[in-house]
């Protein structure tokens, strides 16, 4: 099983950030998707969870402005059915269903909550 790419920020996802992140796994969202801290935005190519910032934008220089964005080709996001989403999640993750979308998220939205959950799970396995 692969790990999750977890958003560390809340806001609209940027093309530049997603373009950089797609090298590290497959994305579940497209640019301008509203994301929140703790939301799973993709699947990591490795089997560890990764905290990522999908809001990071390119630093614009005076002359080269946003015209270069056309060169950033994004792989279309992987859209999941409810069944696929339920199959994909681990014990520490939830599927969030609204009339418009199916989203994945961590139970603990903040990094320290996720670390605490992981520590408790490891200590349970040791007992």
Residue ranges and their predicted role:
Residues 1-127:
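Accessory interaction regions appended to the cores of large information-processing enzymes
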């Amino acid at each position: 099983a692969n790990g999750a790419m977890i958003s560390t920020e809340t806001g609209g996802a940027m093309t530049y950030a997603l373009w950089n992140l797609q090298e590290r796994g497959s994305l579940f969202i497209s640019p301008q998707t509203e994301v929140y801290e703790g939301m799973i935005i993709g699947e990591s190519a490795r089997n560890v969870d990764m905290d990522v910032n999908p809001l990071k934008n390119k630093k614009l220089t005076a002359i080269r402005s946003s015209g270069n964005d056309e060169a950033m080709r994004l792989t279309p996001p992987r859209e999941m059915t409810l069944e696929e989403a339920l199959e994909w999640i681990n014990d520490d993750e939830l599927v969030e269903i609204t009339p418009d979308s199916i989203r994945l998220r961590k139970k603990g939205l903040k990094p320290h909550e996720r670390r605490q959950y992981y520590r408790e799970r490891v200590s349970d396995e040791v007992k």
